[in-house]
Swiss-Prot record:
InterPro entries linked: Class_I_gatase-like, PdxT/SNO, PdxT/SNO_CS
Function text: Catalyzes the hydrolysis of glutamine to glutamate and ammonia as part of the biosynthesis of pyridoxal 5'-phosphate. The resulting ammonia molecule is channeled to the active site of PdxS.
Pathway per the UniProt entry: Cofactor biosynthesis; pyridoxal 5'-phosphate biosynthesis
Residues binding L-glutamine, per UniProt: G52, E53, S54, R116, I143, R144
Keyword Hydrolase annotated: yes
Example GO biological process: pyridoxal phosphate biosynthetic process
Gene3D superfamilies: 3.40.50.880
A single MF term (Gene Ontology): pyridoxal 5'-phosphate synthase (glutamine hydrolysing) activity
Protein family according to the UniProt entry: Belongs to the glutaminase PdxT/SNO family.
Organism, scientific name: Pyrobaculum neutrophilum (strain DSM 2338 / JCM 9278 / NBRC 100436 / V24Sta) (Thermoproteus neutrophilus)
Active site positions, chain numbering: C84 (nucleophile), H184 (charge relay system), E186 (charge relay system)
Primary gene name: pdxT
Official protein name in the record: Pyridoxal 5'-phosphate synthase subunit PdxT
Length: 202
């Protein structure tokens, strides 16, 4: 089985290592590849979209022809994890905590609303312990993190947190074969990557 990591920008290597370690823990044979072109999507059984800068990821995906290819593959059932900026890229509604509505290129596939930079900039980074059904307990690392504020359709918000200004917000969202996290699981745990490998068809 092949797992793919979108390799346009962000912490690509950390996701590659997290998939490799998760596969080892599950006793599975998994090759992890970088996804840089539309044709790279053809053979993978699961995908991670890393954090980074969401407007840059969207612009590069459009320029390389990956925007439509990613949308088609994920709509077709490819299990996909979006972390931090990757979660923003998956969402249908995106606004910034400072500038409001954004016009950035997004996949627009998950029925969730996301606020970019909800926890401030780099200096407001933090870690918390979270527990989520199906994934278990994990240490979550938030870096310039977004927040999920609303879900509709078949999407489900998870991992609740109290935000000083936004009130009750959520650090994760699930919708069928798609998972979005406001935090960076690749930096502290293999639990989310194990979950994704278990979603994938062998």
């Amino acid at each position: 089985m092949k797992a793919g990591v979108l390799a346009l920008q962000g912490d690509v290597e950390e996701h590659i290592q997290a998939f490799r370690k998760a596969a080892q823990e599950l006793g599975r044979s998994v090759e992890v590849v970088q996804v840089k072109r539309p044709q790279d999507l053809r053979e993978i059984a699961v995908l991670a979209i890393p954090g980074g800068e969401s407007t840059t990821i969207g612009a590069l995906a459009r320029r390389t022809g990956l925007l439509d290819a990613l949308r088609d593959a994920i709509k077709g059932g490819l299990p996909t994890l979006g972390t931090c900026a990757g979660a923003i890229f998956l969402a249908k509604e995106v606004r910034d905590s400072v500038v409001g509505e954004t016009k950035q290129p997004i996949l627009g596939l998950m029925d969730i609303a996301v606020v970019r930079n909800a926890f401030g900039r780099q200096r407001e980074s933090f870690e918390v312990d979270l527990r989520e059904e199906g994934i278990g307990a994990l240490k979550a690392v938030f870096i310039r993190a977004p927040a999920f504020t609303k879900a509709w359709g078949s999407a489900r918000l998870a991992a609740p947190l109290k935000h000083p200004e936004l009130g009750q917000i959520y650090a994760a969202a699930f919708q069928g074969h798609m998972v979005a996290t406001a935090f960076h699981p690749e930096l502290s745990t293999t639990a989310v990557h194990r979950y994704m490998l278990n979603l994938a068809k062998t």
